[in-house]
Amino acid sequence: MSRFRLLLLSLIVLCGTFLFSESTFAKTIVNPNQTYSTTTLLNDIKKLEKTYPGLVKKEVIGKSEYGRNIYAVSLGKGDSTVFINGSHHAREWITTNLTMNMIDKYAAAYHSNSNLNGYNVKKLLNNTTIWFVPMVNPDGVTLQQFGLKYFPAKDHAKIIKMNAGSKNFKRWKANAKGVDLNRQYSPNWNLLGGPKNPSYKNYNGPKVASASETKAVLSFVDKIDPEMAISYHSSGQIIFWKYQQTGSRYTQDAKYAGKLSTITGYSLVKSKSFGGGFSDWFSNVEKKPAFTIEVSPAVGETHVPLKNYAKIWSQNASIGLYTAQEGFKLFDTRNTVASEKVAKQIKTYNKTAAKLKNYYSTDIKSQSNLKVTSAHKSLYDKTSKEIKKQEKIIAKLPAKYRSKPNAALKTTKSYRDNALTYMTAIQAGDALSTTNKKLMEYLTAGKLNNTTFAAYDKLVKQTTTTESKIKKMYSKNVQRLATAKYITPAKTNKKNTDYDIARYKLLLDMEEQLENEQYDKVKKNITKYKKMKSTNLHKKLESRFKTMIKAIEDELLLLEAEVPVEPEQPAPPNKEPEVPEPTPEPDPEVPEDGTAA
């Protein structure tokens, strides 16, 4: 008996645990077992966004013909995207219940890190973002659910006319302006039959994508660039998938359609599409897999009863996850191929870019080779342009797929950068040589003035800058040659110029000291000047110095001759200092009475 009780207790605990985990997982926001209105839609979207921040986000992608918001909801964090829409047709709003329930259940599974029907939801949604537009046709849905109540009175008669005079709108498929939104897309649009004027169903509009709702969907799909699309409809438990694909695309889409059929139990439609539908457009224009899934047995011209929903959910619960899984595979394959293609293109160009090395290293054998040729500059410009082009291409790749092309482009950039470093150093060196030459000309001409001093200062700065640039050059041999050609002559001339400028400034100081009659200082500076040996580099300058020093010496002699010489005073003889004789103190006064005071 005790063993039986123990076993029973274990079963109770196990069942309780199972029920708890299921209850936790099953905590829902969306109630799909109700007439799902635009108000319910918005309230649930807001709750989902608040409950799952960073995972669920809403976006208004446009307005309906009567100004209602058309909402898109993203679920996931991946770069890969897939697209699922519902309620193109007003009476098929059960597909809004379905898509909103997907968002709710998938988000809960992600949050609890739970699998759903064998799918790792967190992994899938980290790789792929599923974009839903749960209700493409909010005007039509509102009209079908509530009649004319929420539409302007001035339009009632027109809407009733589109419904063949009936005020019962349960059969309504179109938007509230009488345009069938799933007959608005471009493939074979002009071949579609049906009404020639606005109607509750099948009127394809005055032109392709004339309806606001269709424009919003087209613009949004262009923006998110999904890998795969599911368009949900409600009648027939069938899957449309053949949209004139051929070759590998046909084989690929047939595989996907087969899996969708296996998951849902729905039949694949073998007949050709009539055209004008969203999936026709996505497959034909975007050249990507698209499937129209009809979720319920045919119920006639009305909405699907809510009693059918439980089965619809059981058949479709995994569809969004399967779509996300396969969408990511397509995304990954496409971007891997694109990444490798770009990397290959860059590597091919690198054979051309490598020729830059001849200009900045290989062909530099002597100082005479230190120059920037037009061919060098042309190849550098071409390589820079190629790098910018490839950078733009790489930037379009998701971050995960940029490493290979970036690695190849790094080599291209090294050739470009080394070429630029070389050109920059040569340009700086040539400018330094020009300044050095100019300074030499001034000194040789015997010019020492503000212009000469400015050239000297410029030489000092350019020498430092050029030396820094040379140290960055690719080859040590090229650095050595550039130093010998540019830096050594500049530093030598600077050294000699330093000496000449110092002599010149000393001469100017002596002239000023003469004017101020500071003769002792002049004499000392003359001695100092004569100890400064001539470099004999600039004859005119040296001649000028000799003239100046002679003039100073002559002036000093003349001035010294005019100064009167004072006779020297003999020093006084050494003797003891005179000591003054003491002065006798007066006798104290004696009073008349003969007593001392």
List the predicted regions and their residue ranges.
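Active-site/substrate-binding loop(s) of hydrolase catalytic cores
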Residues: 79, 94, 101-103, 107-240, ...
